[in-house]
Regions:
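Short alpha-helix plus adjacent loop in nuclease-associated cores
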Residues: 55-76
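Acidic/histidine-rich catalytic cores and adjacent linkers
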Residues: 5, 12-49, 56-57, 76-176
């Protein structure tokens, strides 16, 4: 539902106006704190699920920022090379064509740190292929350790997931 404002009070007023709001069992949303606060106050028995699209978008955004930071250190020709795979880096590995894989292989041979960033992005995305919460939390925990040891640009992702872990992992109990 689209509301005129995104503030907590507007959301609370909307939730309070819903008929039979006590029958609402699950609310799906993005990671906007006022929404979470409003739902917890107005619908205390409802489970909040963070839409997986928003979670995966976070890591794609950080990967894109990392690529841009890397480009700042490179020549114009090297920047052009890396920027030529920008969309491919955001794609899921399983959806890549042979030509895209070949192009990435070449880029990775020159910029192994970009391969690390992509591989970690894909590992994170694969969390959503888990069939239950326990497996997802375990996979995330392993991923998080790897990030802390090997790739600091994704630390912000771990901080966000930790802050929203209940709502993110509720996805595995209510996969919407």
């Amino acid at each position: 539902e689209m509301l005129p404002k995104r503030d907590k009070q507007t959301v609370m007023n909307y939730l309070d106006s819903l008929p039979d709001s006590n029958n609402i069992k699950v609310v799906t949303m993005d990671m906007y704190r006022p929404y979470r606060e409003a739902v917890y106050e107005c619908l205390p028995d409802a489970a909040i699920v963070i839409d997986r699209f928003h979670v995966v978008k976070l890591i794609n955004d950080v990967l894109s920022d990392y690529r841009k930071t890397l480009c700042k250190q490179l020549s114009a020709a090297e920047k052009k090379e890396i920027n030529s795979v920008q969309k491919v880096l955001n794609a899921n590995r399983k959806d890549l064509t042979a030509n895209q894989n070949k192009k990435l292989g070449y880029i990775y041979s020159k910029y192994p740190e970009l391969k690390m960033a992509y591989d970690l992005k894909e590992e994170f995305r694969e969390i959503y292929e888990c069939t239950n919460r326990r497996a997802a939390v375990l996979k995330y925990t392993k991923w998080s350790r790897k990030v802390k040891q090997n790739f600091s640009p994704y630390i912000s992702i771990t901080e966000t997931v930790n802050r929203w872990s209940l709502e993110i992992f509720n996805y595995f109990d209510h996969p919407y």
